A protein has these predicted regions:
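Gly/Lys-enriched N-terminal cap/neck module of very large, oligomeric protein machines
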Residues: 2-174
Length: 174
């Protein structure tokens, strides 16, 4: 399984629909300061269920919605879709591609979709549990994440290792 594409519209600095296509060999996103690298990682963790405004580098949740510039009006909605190659069936779905979408409106109402079918945030979290992918997974390592892990409490580090080892789903279902 690997991330094939990230499509953002109205998410933070990405006012216009922006699609980033990736392949198996992609290991990092690089670019100059201010080019949107951190917003791309925020988009990925957000669509996977991040609910902490602090982790999304904002003051309030609606900060993920494009707030406008001198030349562009603010938008009323943010939408992010990520597409995974699932030809190895790492995800327990009978599809070779799996898309996950999250939309949020200024009213703070959210919609979640798996392969364009409405679902709950819980369904997304369960789908990616023990894959190493998810808002708490370590497939996306943002600025400060490594330092955060190293300075975390032993119980928190244990949770990280349980997720990586694929046993956290058993604790979750208890």
């Amino acid at each position: 399984m690997f991330l094939k594409a990230v499509t953002m519209q109205g998410f933070k600095s990405f006012a216009n629909r922006t699609k980033i296509e990736l392949d198996k060999t992609t290991t990092a996103i690089v670019g100059p300061n201010g080019s949107g690298k951190s917003n791309i990682t925020d988009a990925i963790t957000w669509v996977l269920g991040e609910t902490s405004v602090k982790n999304l580098r904002g003051n309030k949740m609606e900060d993920v919605i494009f707030s406008g510039t001198d030349t562009k009006k603010p938008l009323g909605m943010a939408e992010v879709t990520i597409v995974f190659d699932n030809s190895d069936k790492s995800l327990n779905l009978p599809y070779n591609e799996v898309s996950v979408t999250r939309r949020m409106y200024r009213s703070l109402e959210s919609e979640f979709l798996i392969n364009n079918k409405k679902c709950r945030l819980k369904d997304i979290k369960e789908l990616f549990m023990d894959t190493g992918i998810g808002k708490d997974g370590y497939s996306v390592i943002g600025q400060g994440k490594i330092e955060s892990v190293l300075s975390s409490k032993p119980e928190d580090r244990r949770n990280i290792f349980e997720e990586a080892a694929g046993i956290s789903k058993y604790k979750y279902k208890k």
